[in-house]
Amino acid sequence: MIDHTFHPRPLELAKLLLTHGFSVTRIYLDAVNPEEKATFEWLKQQYPGLSYEPTIHPEMRMRPRKEENVLAIGQKAAWFTGTKHFVNLVEGAGLYGFDGIRKVAGLMIEAWQEEKDPEDLIIRKGWGCESCI
């Protein structure tokens, strides 16, 4: 699971992960960035089972959050799935290029091995506290 708050180009991230053997089943995003339109079309053709979920629809807040054994990349993906295994970064956190990919891979391993409490971290973020990230 990937969400659009994790990185400015979530579809490119999904493509990178999928083409390197990772399982990506859902992307949370509200619109397709024009810069990612070709990637979106490629994903639709190559991975027709990939689902796209909006984050701004009110009914998303009421959905059951019971997907505990998944790795979420981004806070919204963590919130909507209910998993405690998530990478807690926003807007790429300045990670760029090969070194950024390498660091994200390390954060993915860490997120799978060490649980976090999404309700504590994400709700604190919503209150505007500085210590959430």
Regions found by a protein language model. Name each.
Residues 1-133:
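An N-terminal assembly and electron-transfer interface module characteristic of large anaerobic redox
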